[in-house]
Amino acid sequence: MAVRPKKALVTAPAFSEYERALGTVGAEVQYYRLKEEQDFRIQEDILEQITEDTDMIFLCNPNNPTGQTTEKELLIRVMNRCNKFGTILVLDECFIEFLEEPERYECRGYLTQYPNVVIIKAFTKIFCMPGVRLGYALCENAALRKRMRAMLQPWNVSVTAQEAGVAALVDCEAYLKRTERIYKKRKVLDDRADEKAWSECMGIGSKLYIF
């Protein structure tokens, strides 16, 4: 890792690779536990767990595996809290394009104001390229970007991944519109889920991670 946090905060449940990455540098991992009675959504009380000892936070929006979203207003308060303590906030937005209104949640417009924020994005999810590892980070902090580059492996993006990325960008708007049309058809799946009494486990924001 480009940053070696001593103490970090992750949600539980969350994508397991966050904790794994933190473990490689011996960081103490603390958990903000998502509760079923709150629909597994992040609440205001997460701010109380961000202290001067918190070096890094990982948040995923929409969350993996619950699919629940966090409103931008709360994320801004989290960013302000992190800014106060010099905490690095890593926002994973790899699934955000699957949301009906992604612009309502994405935070790239705040990067200049909050240089301690790093946004993670990926081609893998939205362009259906499983197994092709192609992702990127957005960050306004030049010093942090330099440290991240220094930690990259040589040839960290394969030629195959590069070609796939270029091909995806050629007609990306049309592809995203097709994805949007498919997304809007999810009501059929919702109705079937209700018939099977699955509505409780599927009553989530983006409904991406059930299968």
Model-derived segments and spans:
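Short beta->alpha connector loops at strand-helix junctions that form conserved
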Residues: 12, 31-36, 93
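Active-site pre-lysine segment of PLP-dependent enzymes
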Residues: 23, 41-53, 65-89, 93-126
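Short Gly/Ser/Thr- and Asp/Glu-enriched loop/turn motifs at secondary-structure junctions
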Residues: 203-209
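Structural motif
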Residues: 9, 56-60, 90, 136-138
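Phosphate-binding glycine-rich loop
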Residues: 1-8
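PLP-dependent aminotransferase class I/II
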Residues: 19, 116-202
